[in-house]
């Protein structure tokens, strides 16, 4: 499963990328606001850090304006993925931009039917939001499973990009289900390496090693 990092923080992206943990990046208007930077400037910098897909989101609501913004964003770098909302206008823009050879990430997906429409419109990625469904006492991971089944049934090439990942358990669940990609904030990715028994075991090893009085270097 590919790891995308969900942030516009270039330092955090670079640190994870140096570890080989970043296959791509996703951004949205909220993350651009949090960065306090110009969207074109920060997106261009991100595209220079990672070689994989970098999702940059349009802010228009009508198809023609979405298409124009998508073309503008795609000029930033070859690895730009134009991010579009899952609306009829977004699907129309998806069809046009994908026909032009541009990568498209259709976002804000909350149902398998929506994911089916995005695949038929030629989306490169579909982004189902797990955490927001969980907030409504629904099973976000069940949605990932349903989309996986539909895409496999009909041979769609659209990649499932599990989004709104909030916990390490979410990461494990979507990996078991078979999501192609997951995108998560840097802090969630950092937590994947943590386990209390690892810490406890390391502490015991260090204590015992100190008692030997030996050194390696």
Curated annotation (Swiss-Prot):
EC numbers for this chain: 2.2.1.2
Catalytic residue positions: 83
Q: Which organism is it from?
A: Roseobacter denitrificans (strain ATCC 33942 / OCh 114)
What is the protein named? Probable transaldolase
Please explain the role this protein plays, according to its UniProt record: Transaldolase is important for the balance of metabolites in the pentose-phosphate pathway.
Which pathway does the protein contribute to?
Answer: Carbohydrate degradation; pentose phosphate pathway; D-glyceraldehyde 3-phosphate and beta-D-fructose 6-phosphate from D-ribose 5-phosphate and D-xylulose 5-phosphate (non-oxidative stage): step 2/3
List, in alphabetical order, the GO biological process terms annotated in this UniProt record. Answer: carbohydrate metabolic process; pentose-phosphate shunt
Q: Which top EC class is given? A: transferase
Asked if the Swiss-Prot or TrEMBL record annotates the protein with the keyword Nucleotide-binding, the reply is no
Q: Which reaction does it catalyse?
A: D-sedoheptulose 7-phosphate + D-glyceraldehyde 3-phosphate = D-erythrose 4-phosphate + beta-D-fructose 6-phosphate
């Amino acid at each position: 499963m590919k790891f995308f990092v969900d942030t516009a923080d270039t330092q955090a992206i670079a640190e994870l990328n140096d570890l080989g943990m970043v296959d791509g990046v996703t951004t949205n208007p909220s993350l651009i606001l949090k960065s306090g930077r110009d969207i074109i400037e920060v997106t261009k910098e991100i595209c220079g850090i990672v070689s994989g897909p970098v999702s940059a989101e349009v802010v228009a609501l009508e198809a023609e304006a979405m298409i124009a913004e998508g073309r503008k964003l795609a000029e930033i770098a070859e690895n730009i993925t134009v991010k579009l909302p899952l609306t009829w206008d977004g699907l129309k823009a998806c069809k046009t931009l994908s026909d032009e050879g541009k990568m498209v990430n259709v976002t804000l997906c909350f149902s398998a039917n929506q994911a089916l429409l995005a695949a038929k419109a030629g989306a490169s990625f579909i982004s189902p939001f797990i955490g927001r469904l969980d907030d409504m006492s629904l099973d976000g991971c069940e949605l990932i499973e349903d989309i996986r089944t539909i895409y496999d049934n009909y041979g769609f090439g659209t990649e499932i990009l599990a989004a709104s990942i909030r916990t390490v358990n979410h990461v494990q669940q979507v990996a078991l289900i078979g999501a192609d990609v997951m995108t998560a904030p840097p802090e969630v990715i950092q937590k994947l390496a943590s386990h209390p028994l690892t810490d406890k075991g390391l502490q015991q090893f260090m204590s015992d090693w100190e008692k030997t009085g030996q050194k390696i270097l």
